[in-house]
């Protein structure tokens, strides 16, 4: 829970993240909270702890298994491919501020829903690009 007395601090952090990201040419991307489980099995690895033990996965009424996103990178990569952005001028630079979900053993200061700010850069393998993303 983020109660009213803490919301201003959260908004400040989010605003700062957005401003810095925009300054370095990153565009905000939004993508679904639920994704097909195959995305994470392929992207994260089907033998990883995240896929094997930590994801919330459900069978959709239409049949396929869907998962609450445990992280952001796989969803961004899927969005780029499905929306035909691979042929755009490189590098592609995106950022996101999202809720993620992991079925981890609850610990002090850690919950199963957490907030993640991330940057992703596709189409460049230079150390300078890595530094920009960081």
Regions from the PLM with identified roles:
Residues 1-134:
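TRNA-recognition modules of translation machinery and tRNA-sensing kinases, especially anticodon-binding
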